């Protein structure tokens, strides 16, 4: 089995692969939580609601700046710096950089008061592209993965095959039939760096949520998002993008076990990633008035330094987990997914 086949087969197992390294252990998270947002930005975030746009678009022709030095090629888009150990054509860089810029654009619309956007971090976000897969593993990549975000030193590592790059003669071409959800997933982790990278269900639910938004020609098709999520969970996903194929009747562990476990515990949950995605979407679009207010308030509590237990009270809103399970079940049942919780 060659490298391309290895990666393709691993896509369906992406939920079982720890895509965030031990740098998300409690100590580094506590350190990043010490950076407190300014009162003005907190107030502004509290007023923001969930994005209502049906579509979000980038310019059709993204400007790319290129710099070269011996053995290294650097390409810069508006917010990202891509450093490659092999040369790439400009149109190829424009194609994959749009995935990162679309992720940045959407995450910037979320009402989560992202530390990334207001702590004076004006430098480009770092993405390192690695031609050889074994080199990717030596640099810290997870075996079988198509990319990984390292909280320290705050960069994304991606092997060429994770981008869908294939050698053609003396250069690389991009396989446009491939889903690149992994890239948006890791870019979402990068955007949410700080106090929000704490609870596994929220960390991975948010990343899966953003990564499942369909894309066409530099445009996020938000209007088709729920259908994309359904396909990703019950079948093989948009453009066969590594979906979980769980079927329309899904048995899950208790909601309490998902929401109260730490990040390492989350990694051990069966089907934790699609489970977290369904829960995240529910809180964003169906709970309460359907405006994501409780999810926003939960994130705001984390940003203010609250522990997970205290922040979760914003989501529970006086309800117990059994009540939330019924609400979650009823909500997804209306959209063709039958959930059954094990208690």
Predicted regions and their residues:
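N-terminal low-structure segments adjacent to metalloprotease catalytic domains
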Residues: 1-75, 94, 318-343
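Residue-level marker of intrinsically disordered, low-complexity segments enriched
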Residues: 12-18, 40, 44, 54-56, ...
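Generic preference for hydrophobic/aromatic residues in regular secondary structure cores
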Residues: 24, 49, 56-62, 82, ...
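Short low-complexity stretches enriched in small and charged residues
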Residues: 29-42, 79-85, 162-166, 188, ...
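Charged, low-complexity, helix/coiled-coil-prone segments
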Residues: 30-53, 123-125, 146-154, 170, ...
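Acidic/His/Gly-enriched intrinsically disordered linker/tail segments
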Residues: 68, 148-163, 178, 197-343
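Juxtacatalytic substrate-recognition/specificity segment
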Residues: 69-199, 307-313
């Amino acid at each position: 089995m060659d490298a391309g086949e290895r990666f393709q087969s691993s896509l369906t197992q992406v939920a079982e692969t720890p895509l965030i390294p031990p740098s998300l252990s409690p100590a580094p998270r506590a350190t990043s939580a010490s950076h407190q947002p300014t009162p003005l930005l907190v107030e502004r975030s509290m007023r923001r609601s969930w994005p209502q746009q049906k579509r979000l678009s980038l310019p059709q022709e993204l400007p790319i700046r290129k710099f070269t030095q011996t053995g290294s090629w650097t390409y810069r888009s508006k917010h990202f710096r891509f450093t490659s150990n092999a040369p790439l054509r400009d149109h190829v860089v424009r194609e994959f950089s749009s995935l990162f810029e679309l992720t940045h654009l959407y995450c910037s619309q979320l009402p989560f008061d992202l530390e990334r956007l207001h702590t004076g971090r004006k430098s480009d976000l770092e993405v390192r592209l690695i031609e050889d897969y074994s080199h990717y593993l030596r640099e810290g990549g997870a075996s079988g993965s198509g990319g990984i975000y390292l909280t320290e030193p705050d960069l994304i590592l991606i092997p060429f095959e994770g981008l869908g790059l294939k050698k053609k003669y003396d250069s690389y071409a991009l396989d446009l039939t491939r889903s690149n959800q992994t890239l948006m997933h890791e870019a979402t982790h990068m955007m949410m760096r700080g106090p929000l990278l704490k609870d596994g269900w929220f960390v991975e639910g948010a990343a899966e949520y953003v990564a499942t938004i369909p894309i066409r020609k530099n445009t996020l098709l938000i209007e088709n998002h729920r259908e994309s999520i359904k396909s990703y969970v019950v079948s093989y996903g948009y453009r066969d993008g590594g979906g979980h194929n769980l079927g329309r009747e899904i048995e899950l562990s208790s909601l309490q076990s998902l929401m109260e476990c730490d990040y390492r515990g989350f990694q051990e949950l069966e089907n934790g990633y699609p489970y977290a995605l369904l829960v995240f979407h529910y809180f964003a679009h169906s709970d309460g008035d359907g405006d994501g207010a409780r999810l926003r308030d939960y994130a705001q509590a984390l940003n203010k330094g609250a522990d997970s237990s205290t922040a979760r009270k914003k989501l529970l809103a006086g309800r117990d987990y059994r009540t939330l399970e019924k609400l979650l079940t009823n909500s997804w049942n209306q959209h063709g997914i039958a959930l059954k919780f094990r208690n």
